[in-house]
């Protein structure tokens, strides 16, 4: 599947140009949000926020929602949250198409493990293992990896391929 190759390439090659531990503001984040909204994801900002998360992607079947909670100011963490939650939407589309469990990463496990071990800061790995059930570790590691290594434009391309059919 072309998407798997693109995800692996995005994760592995982008790390050479982006400092993985650095959240960043991207001009194309708004375009990514529009793409998601235009393709069936109900995106809400600062609604039903309780202070326990920056964002969440939820779905029932193909009824999809992304809730973002940037608060009064939008910063690099909020841009990273959009990329992260968009990756979860890609995982959802791919798993529906493949008929695999919703907590299955898009990348094959060997590629994901190699990328996580070489590119995710240990603090992120520890955060995921501390805050998520073990059966969600792989999808959260993948979302964190791409949040840090892929641009909003690259994630938009992956979303288009996985969820729109482009």
Q: Language-model segments: what does each one mean?
A:
Residues 35-67:
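N-terminal targeting signals for Sec/Tat export/insertion, comprising classic cleavable signal peptides
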Residues 24-25, 29-44, 102-166:
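Metalloprotease/metallohydrolase-associated module, dominated by Zn2+-dependent proteases
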Residues 18-23:
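Sec/Tat signal peptide C-region and signal peptidase I cleavage site
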Residues 66-82:
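Short pre-active-site segment immediately N-terminal to the catalytic Zn-binding motif
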Residues 8-17:
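Bacterial N-terminal signal peptides
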Residues 1-8:
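Bacterial N-terminal signal peptides that target proteins for export
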Residues 86-103:
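Catalytic Zn2+-binding segment of zinc metalloproteases
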Residues 48-50, 68-70, 92-94, 162-166:
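Sequence contexts marking disulfide-bonded cysteines in secreted/extracellular proteins
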């Amino acid at each position: 599947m072309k998407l798997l190759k693109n995800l692996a390439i995005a994760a592995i090659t982008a790390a050479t140009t982006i400092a993985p531990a650095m959240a960043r503001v991207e001009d194309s984040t708004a375009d990514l949000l529009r793409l998601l909204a235009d393709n069936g994801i109900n995106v809400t900002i600062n609604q039903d926020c309780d202070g326990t998360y920056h964002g969440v992607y939820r779905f029932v079947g193909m009824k999809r929602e992304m809730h973002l909670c940037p608060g009064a100011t939008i910063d690099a963490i909020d841009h990273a949250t959009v990329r992260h939650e968009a990756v979860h939407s890609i995982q959802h589309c791919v798993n529906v198409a493949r008929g695999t469990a919703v907590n299955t990463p898009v990348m094959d496990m060997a590629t994901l493990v190699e990328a996580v071990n070489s590119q995710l800061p240990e603090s992120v790995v520890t955060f995921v293992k501390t805050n998520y059930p073990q059966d969600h570790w792989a999808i959260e590691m993948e979302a964190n990896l791409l949040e840090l290594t892929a641009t909003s434009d690259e994630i938009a391309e992956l979303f288009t391929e996985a969820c729109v059919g482009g």
